[in-house]
Swiss-Prot record:
Subcellular location(s) per record: Plastid, Chloroplast inner membrane
Protein name as it appears in the record: Potassium/proton antiporter CemA
Catalytic activity, reaction form: K(+)(in) + H(+)(out) = K(+)(out) + H(+)(in)
Organism: Arabis hirsuta
Gene Ontology molecular-function annotations: antiporter activity; proton transmembrane transporter activity
InterPro entries assigned: CemA
Amino acid sequence: MAKKKAFIPFFYFTSIVFLPWLISLCCNKSLKIWITNWWNTRQCETFLNDIQEKSVLEKFIQLEDLFQLDEMIKEYPETDLQQFRLGIHKETIQFIKIHNEYHIHTILHFSTNLISFVILSGYSFWGKEKLFILNSWVQEFLYNLSDTIKAFSILLLTDLCIGFHSPHGWELMIGYIYKDFGFAHYEQILSGLVSTFPVILDTIFKYWIFRYLNRVSPSLVVIYHAIND
């Protein structure tokens, strides 16, 4: 009975890891049809921001230029204007369908992320006792490690998160989150986040070493600085 109770927090942690994937899978299947019908039947105005509107106009201009170029390189004695307009019309309809699919995908992912956040928040709130047990297990495991292993682990983690090559990883991660929530790609915003977020983490980490580790384990701080130097 005691072993069974001891495994309950472990099962709870496993459920937290896989619960977002299950929520995403269920929401994508159940909400996609509803959101698609709502978007297509309502025929609401597209809520474009300045970045998205500029992107749409650029794609329309590129589409028209490609058709004009295609007609110019053809060695026909006379240009069939009606056929040209028909091709433009078909490609425009196809582009509108793709644009609608993009908005449906954006709404679907944003709704799924919001639902996942609400469910996980409630799940974590009702399982505070299990989280407390897991936290005690982690603290006990870290406490039993030697100071050398702790210092090496801290150094490895900081180099991965805020090291010289970390901006490439942050760029991929922030870009994925930015895209998953349906925001339009904006290079300046992404560059700003990539350049400032690791700096903020570095400052917080140095403050944590100065404020917490110096008080709890001064020897760990000495070993960390020795390895880092």
